[in-house]
Every structure is written in C-alpha cells, then in structure tokens.
Amino acid sequence: METIFKHFLLIVSAFCFAGTVAGQNPTIDPVAVFTNSESEQTELRPGESYSGSAPLTVEFSANPQDADGWTATYEWRFYTEGNTQQPYLIRYEENTNFTFTSAGTHLVACYAVFKRGDERIEYTEEYWTTEAQPIQISISESNLEMPNAFAPNGDPRSSIYKAKKNYKSIVEFHAIIINRWGQKLYEWDDPAGGWDGTFHGNPVAEGTYFVIVNAKGADGKVFKIRKDVNLLRGYREPASTTNP
C-alpha cells in the first residue's frame, strides 16, 4: 500500500492545511469566502488573515484537485487561538459554512484523506505542521451607541434613526421606539435597520420620543440602552466642508 502524507492548514482564525503532491496525486487548495464590512466578497487562503465584526458567515471549500477516481473524506476543525488541541467544532464535509459570533481569533483546519484501491494519500497535521499557514479571522470586541436625535426630512445622512455607524460585533439586537404615553411606535431587530419617524405610514409630530435597546455583543457584553430621541422636522444637517 502506498501512503503519501500531506498537511493543510487554513485559519479564520480557522485552520485548514495546504500543500502540493507531485504528479497527478489529488491535492486540496482550501479557501474561505465571505462578505466583508464594505460589502465586498473576500477570499482567504493559507497565510492570509482578516479582522472584522460579528456576525461573520464564512463559506469553506476544500477545493480538491486531480481527485477523479479517488474516494475522499474531509474533516474541518475549528479552534480558538491558544487552544489548538481541542476543536470547538468538527464538520465532516467537503464544503461547509460557519457564522462566527464570538470575539477573538479563530483557527480552522481542513484534513483530507484520498483512497484508490491500495493507495492512500493523507493531508494531515502530523507531517506538515511546520509548513502550516493559518488563515486567521479575528472577531472584534463589541460596541453599540444610539444617537439622541434625528431629522426625517429625506436627507439620507439623518432621516433614519438607527445605531451609530461605529457599532461592532452585535450578535443580538432588539430596539423599540415609544412615545411619552408608552405606546409602541416601531421596533426592529437589526442594528443596521432603524425608524423613519412614522407610525402606520404616517409621519409623527416633532418632539421627544424614547428608545429602548437590548443587545448582546460577540464578547458577551450586554447592552441595555434607554434614552430620549429628539425628532426634528425641517432640520437639515449642514454639508461637510473641507478647509483649503
């Protein structure tokens, strides 16, 4: 029996191990694909890294090459940085996906074993640990702030009441707008969403309203926000200027 060992590492911080085998022996070229914070599709391969906000959904592919006629098995192992001996998740698929919701650096490893008759080719950790190039995905600590005023006048900069743009790694979110009598006017479950200053499609009067937010970050931090919201009609945010 011929056995050839290889090892592939990929990290988000996820591990999947990479290498090449001479000739037409099957290989894997692991890749992680996701949409970054700028809404751009991003690919990571061994030796590359990414830092961003949760929740982050990543598609993993073992991407086998020259594998026709071979029977393959795959194992994706997910670790946290500093704990590479004990994966917190194992997936037995050629392609898989995972949503990262915990702050910190995650490591993901992809193992593959190819069999054809008496031949066996393994891409495992044992023989290529020194050449493993982790793809690292680091999830930031959480942050969430809500503004105290907005002006629903059609100006896209201020017409929707929503979380400030600096929010990060919010994995649970629920917000409610109420009036001074405690009547619920609007609620939403995504920090990217918000209130347009209407109730049942009709604009509400200028004045003071209240927002109640319950949220949780990827780092376990709990946010309980209660504050006034000043709705200003007829106000337009001044255009930004650049000093000469």
Predicted features and spans:
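Short loop/turn motifs at secondary-structure boundaries
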Residues: 49-50, 54-61, 103, 134-244
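Terminal edge beta-strands and adjacent linker/stalk segments
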Residues: 125-136
